[in-house]
Amino acid sequence: KFELFRNEYKDYLENLGISAFVYPFIIKGFKFFSDDSGKLGELFKVLEIVLFRAKLINSRANIQERLNKILLDFEGDIDILKEDIKKKLNESWYWGDENTKNYLDDTNMYNFGVVNYILWRYENFLQNKGYSIQNFSIENEQIEHISPKKPDNGVIENGYDIDENKNYDDEFESEYLHCIGNLMLISGSHNASIGNKPFTDKLESYNKNPLLNQQAEIKNFSKIENGLPVWKKESIDERHQKIVNFGVETWNFDK
């Protein structure tokens, strides 16, 4: 029945990759309300939040142990389930509200396994403001550094936060380069074509190839210096905060 069920949160669970600890909750859900798609949707929404936090915060602590009693006590009341899970995760801190925000705020999101999923959900959020698109696909999906990584041979081009020697400072390298505010979903072919180009050229390519709204909105965060668009710490900070706020609100049990 799960395979045949149609629901956006079921799709989200599958996109995340369903961990073993989630299946017993799904089985119990079908036991209690196999004929109530609304209730199943509510359950999957709760489970997606738990699963996302477990994948984001890949702790050695065992989330399944903490959820076992809640699973045993679950008798079909989703509000009680949600409150019990929220309380338990906040008690254990690892997957609680505060630590979830800390991880979303991390300065090295590039190495997180869920970065594609976060940006994919962010894209859904941007697109749903205008019209509804639940599923979109990008050929050879990759993560683009808007302010580029330093090329192996050559220097960083103009329009970025570089010094007179065309280098990033230590703060930029450690806190800005790999944070979520500087990362974007892009197709592999597009990524290969823009690489280490000046920001003016990169911005033009985003606007010419607006497959994703997150590409089109970069112009809203960019600043102007000497008549040309630039992508520096201030822009990254602003976009970073917007995506972190989106994440805190999206993977929150209280919404």
Residue ranges and their predicted role:
Residues 1-120, 226:
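A cross-family structural signal marking well-folded subdomains
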Residues 19, 176, 236:
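Aromatic-acidic/polar surface patches that form glycan- and anion
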Residues 27, 44, 48, 140, ...:
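Short, well-ordered alpha-helical packing segments
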Residues 27, 40, 57, 61, ...:
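General "foldedness" signal
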Residues 31, 52, 124, 192, ...:
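Residue-level marker of positions within ordered structural domains that often coincide
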Residues 32-38, 129-135, 193, 250-254:
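Secondary-structure transition/capping motifs at alpha-helix termini
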Residues 35-45, 49-58, 67, 87-97, ...:
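C-terminal, well-folded lobe of enzymatic/effector domains
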Residues 76-215:
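Betabetaalpha-Me/HNH-type nuclease active-site subdomain
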